Amino acid sequence: MRVIRSSIAGLAAWLLATQCVLAQPAATRPKVLAFFTVGGELDHLLFAQQAMRVFGARAADGGYAFAATSDWDVLNDSTLKDVRVVIWLNDMPRTAAQRQAFERYMTGGGAWLGFHISGFGTNAWPWFTEFLGGIRFSASNWPALPARVNVDDRAHSVVNGLPPTFVAPINEWYSWTPSPRTNPDVKVLLTLDSSNFPLGVKNTLNGGDIPVAWINSKFRMVYLNYGHGDRVYSTPILPAMIDNALRWLLNPSP
């Protein structure tokens, strides 16, 4: 419990500092707003905390203004009209009002970057099921483990500069039914390599087509199935992809 309190205290202090920075002229830059939840699984909170620090530190060089909130009621029309990109770090909206505001935002041309657990919304939100590619969560490995990942489309801006294959840090890898690849509107960017299987001990992924990152061309969105624990930023490859994804969402390009 001491670890959780420490993480929350550090996060609160950082958010206060971020709010002070955003009160300065950076507000003229396109706005990126991240949503997170304090609570739930600690590994998800640790990722959210680390990601917010990095987004905040890179905002000036990236040409955007960054803010974060744990108040999901901020996901409303009044706020979103001024936001270029919405990020879900370790949760998803729970109320009808929040979800409907997000639907209007995305169908109106907004942009979204979602990590890991945010994909669980497919099991209780029909619109989001279609948004993510017409899929539902199926299974995952446990414990969290590293895995070899292959780049599917090296020409896409989101994976620009990534090696064709690499070992990603420990993660709870999700599989989906059906595979997102079966949707003609989905472009898969990363996939688990078949050499990983069987993957897991208590819960095992035994094979199949398991995409790790993709876009749905009907929307301006990127889903990345990593965000479990604080190892994502321990190697340069995944952070580079996150930077690419945000850059692509801010500045549409092929």
List each model region and its residues.
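Bacterial N-terminal signal peptides
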Residues: 7-19
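Positively charged n-region of N-terminal signal peptides that target proteins for export
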Residues: 1-5
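Generic alpha-helical structural context detector
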Residues: 9, 130-133, 243, 247
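Catalytic beta-strand/loop cores that center a nucleophilic Ser/Cys/Thr
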Residues: 138-218
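Helical hinge/lid and interdomain linker segments adjacent to catalytic or ligand-binding clefts
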Residues: 29-122
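Extracellular ligand-binding/catalytic regions of CAZymes and related secreted enzymes
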Residues: 24-36, 46, 54-57, 61, ...
